[in-house]
């Protein structure tokens, strides 16, 4: 599977390359797929986590996200525009902050 962002919309594609799910927000800047979760960074700096069925898992309370990456199987690193990195779990709870 892979996540493809085009014109602010994200499609999760299956193994054959056919679209499986289209995520609802229309202003997506970046999408990262890891196992059964997709983390998206919106153009306004917010970050959301979806499962591969397209259901919203959580919205993170940051408004200046530059990009995200997965840490292990159950945590998400949110990189801010000012260089700070926050590690959150999939429930939205802040685990650790790095400067």
Task: Give the predicted meaning of each segment.
Residues 1-17:
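An edge-strand/N-cap motif at the start of beta-rich repeat modules
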Residues 82-99:
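Blade-level signature of beta-propeller repeat domains, shared across WD40, Kelch, NHL, RCC1
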């Amino acid at each position: 599977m892979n996540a493809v962002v085009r014109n602010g919309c994200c499609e999760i594609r299956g193994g054959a390359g056919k679209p499986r799910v289209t995520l609802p927000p229309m202003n997506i800047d970046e999408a990262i797929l890891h196992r059964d979760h997709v983390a998206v960074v919106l153009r306004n700096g917010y970050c959301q986590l979806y499962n591969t069925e397209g259901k919203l898992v959580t919205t993170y309370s940051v408004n200046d996200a530059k990009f995200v990456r997965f840490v292990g199987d159950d945590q998400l690193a949110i990189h801010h525009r000012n260089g700070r990195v926050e590690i959150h779990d999939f429930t939205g709870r802040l685990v650790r902050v790095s400067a």
